[in-house]
């Protein structure tokens, strides 16, 4: 890309006692990756979810910086495999961390290609004249929808939407999804936790992202939108303009 600018913000929301969302936003190289964006939404009692998301972000950066692998998918797959194993060990060693885990959605732009890795239900979008979800939710309701056993937006959907089927640190192995998308310029990249997407319609998100305001203003407006609509969860947002 000729230029890439990004802004990030996380907020506790209006109802949660602690913020279990973590993020990392770098337009500068991280190891062999020319840039790196990550959002993680932790789960677990006490401070376990907070620890899981923060540790995952921190350790992913460390492992990516040290990686001797060459292609983005290999770098990311090996890093998250190691992080998953380390988190499992920590949960076995410390009962306060039992049951912890975290979602992870991650993006990097290499030349004119977007690489996305996803585990759980935090999301990555590409936005221009339309809003396009790149990542795929690993959730109980999405599996039922895929089998034709549930309708998106139904009462049952909202009751069970937060049950995720994949997470970092929750199972002995972790299976991320990878997506590779060509870029043409003029797109906006959005990574966020469900604290935004559960509180805001896609079109309202797209309108803010494409409003023409400066990056910091638009990023803050997305967080404000989630809080204005109830702020029932922590909110993490990374917004990047791809030119």
PLM feature spans:
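PP2C/PPM-type serine/threonine phosphatase catalytic domain
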Residues: 1-243
């Amino acid at each position: 890309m000729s230029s890439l600018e990004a802004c990030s913000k996380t907020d506790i929301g209006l109802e949660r006692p602690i913020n279990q969302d973590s993020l990392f936003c770098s337009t500068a190289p991280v190891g062999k990756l020319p840039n790196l964006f990550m959002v993680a939404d932790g789960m677990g009692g006490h401070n376990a979810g907070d620890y899981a998301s923060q540790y995952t972000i921190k350790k992913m950066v460390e492992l990516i910086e040290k990686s001797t692998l060459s292609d983005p998918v290999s770098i990311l797959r090996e890093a998250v495999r190691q992080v998953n194993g380390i988190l499992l060990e920590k949960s076995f060693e410390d009962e306060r961390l039992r049951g912890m885990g975290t979602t992870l959605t991650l993006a990097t732009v290499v030349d004119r290609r977007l690489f996305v890795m996803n585990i759980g239900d935090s999301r990555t979008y590409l936005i221009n004249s339309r809003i396009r979800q790149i990542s795929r939710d690993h959730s109980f309701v999405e599996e039922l929808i895929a089998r034709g056993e549930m309708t998106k937006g139904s009462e049952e959907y909202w009751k069970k939407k937060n049950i995720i089927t994949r997470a970092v640190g929750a199972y002995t192995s972790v299976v991320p999804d990878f997506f590779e998308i060509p870029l043409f310029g003029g797109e906006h990249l959005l990574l966020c936790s469900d604290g935004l997407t559960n509180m805001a319609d896609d079109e309202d998100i797209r309108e803010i992202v494409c409003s023409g305001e400066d990056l910091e203003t638009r990023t803050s407006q997305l967080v404000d939108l989630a809080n204005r609509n109830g702020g029932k969860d922590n909110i993490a947002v990374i917004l990047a303009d791809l030119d």
